[in-house]
């Protein structure tokens, strides 16, 4: 197959859609993955415009826990990404799409159907988000913890292929940490809007190296100025929020494994011959891995779980919030990339990816 057109990359996140062009270092556009409906005139708004009018719109979230659940609204988001954010005609571009590690096969087929039949794109490439993150790590083998706003997964990848039988969904993500922070702030007497709580979490929270040792340290206290000018002081809550990543059974009241134990369990499900390769490239990806201190804490916890002679390398690139998108951009630079794509002729002949 020879397709002499440019390629665009779209990372379909539950919270944020990221779109841009192959070969670039960062997405051109990032906007909320939401659709707002005006109940009076039935007009629809997407992304930032929907966010700005949220008080008068019914907001809909077409991606839940990483899985597309509303295809009509998802189509609106893709249309917005193509025409409004990037200013491109999809029929003139290869489209690279990310998908959840546990995306149902029927969802993958629906993505192809919309791209070929609605947007008339000449070819597509759909790949597991974790594989894109591995590309961004500079290696082809490793184990990925991808944690965004509403979904977290652990995915071992060997020679560029995800290993589905050892892949796991963690059952908690950034939105759950935001909920936890909201409860902690309520206990302090602060009843704040969710976006403010989220901002506090993202700007001030960090991961402790030893939670029980640090929790009562008075130097933890930090100040945050609210939109009305009031300054509030927050202390141990900043640690307790992020600690949910490692101790979800304490903070979320569940029997879920923390991110460290989930990585260990996933590795143990893989062939013993690749264990060292996986431990040697533990890749952190997604916005909910951006907490300062998470890299050292992960190393510390895995050192206690893995065999004593194991070399553990935590790969936490500073741009890891965009690792999935960047990995897709890197893939598009491979010389034989067009040959790897699924084109319209393939779709017409086989009807499925």
Swiss-Prot record:
Role summary: Actins are highly conserved proteins that are involved in various types of cell motility and are ubiquitously expressed in all eukaryotic cells. Multiple isoforms are involved in various cellular functions such as cytoskeleton structure, cell mobility, chromosome movement and muscle contraction.
Family as reported in the entry's similarity comment: Belongs to the actin family.
The UniProt record lists the keyword Ligase: no
One Pfam entry name: Actin
Keywords: ATP-binding, Cytoplasm, Cytoskeleton, Hydrolase, Nucleotide-binding
GO molecular function, one term: myosin binding
Listed SMART domains: ACTIN (SM00268)
Reaction(s) the record says it catalyses: ATP + H2O = ADP + phosphate + H(+)
Superkingdom in the source lineage: Eukaryota
Organism: Dictyostelium discoideum
Subcellular location: Cytoplasm, Cytoskeleton
The keyword Cytoplasm appears for this protein: yes
Assigned EC number: 3.6.4.-
GO biological process: phagocytosis
Lineage: Eukaryota, Amoebozoa, Evosea, Eumycetozoa, Dictyostelia
GO cellular component: actin cytoskeleton; cytoplasm
Name used for this protein in its record: Putative actin-28
């Amino acid at each position: 197959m020879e397709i002499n057109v440019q390629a665009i990359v779209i990372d379909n996140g539950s919270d944020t859609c990221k779109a841009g062009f192959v070969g670039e270092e960062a997405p051109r556009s990032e906007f909320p993955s939401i659709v707002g409906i005006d109940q009076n005139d039935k007009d629809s708004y997407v992304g930032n415009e929907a966010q700005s009018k949220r008080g008068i719109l019914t907001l809909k979230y077409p991606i839940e826990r990483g899985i597309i659940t509303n295809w009509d609204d998802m189509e609106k988001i893709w249309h917005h990404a193509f025409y409004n954010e990037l200013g491109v005609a999809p029929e003139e571009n290869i489209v690279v799409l990310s998908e959840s590690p546990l995306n149902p096969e029927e969802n993958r087929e629906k993505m192809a159907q919309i791209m070929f039949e609605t947007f008339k794109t000449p070819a597509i490439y759909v790949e597991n988000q974790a594989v894109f993150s591995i590309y961004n790590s500079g290696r082809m083998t490793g184990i990925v913890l991808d944690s965004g706003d509403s979904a977290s997964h652990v995915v071992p990848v060997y020679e560029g292929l995800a290993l589905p039988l050892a892949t796991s969904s963690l059952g908690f993500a950034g939105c759950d940490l935001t909920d936890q922070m909201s409860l902690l702030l309520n206990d302090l007497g602060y009843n704040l809007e969710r976006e403010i709580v989220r901002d506090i979490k993202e700007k001030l929270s960090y991961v402790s190296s030893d939670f029980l040792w640090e929790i009562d340290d008075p130097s933890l206290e930090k100040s945050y100025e609210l939109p009305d000018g009031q300054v509030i002081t927050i202390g141990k809550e900043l640690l307790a929020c992020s600690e949910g990543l490692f101790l979800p059974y304490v903070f979320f009241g569940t029997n879920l494994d923390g991110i460290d134990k989930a990585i260990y369990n996933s590795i143990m499900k893989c062939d013993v011959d690749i264990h060292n390769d996986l431990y040697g490239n533990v890749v952190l990806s997604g916005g909910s891995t951006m907490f300062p201190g998470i890299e050292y804490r992960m190393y510390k916890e895995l050192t206690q779980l893995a065999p004593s002679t194991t070399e553990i390398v935590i790969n936490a690139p500073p741009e890891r919030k965009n690792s999935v998108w960047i990995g897709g951009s890197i893939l598009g630079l491979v010389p034989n990339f067009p040959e790897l794509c699924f084109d319209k002729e393939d779709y017409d002949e086989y009807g499925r990816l």
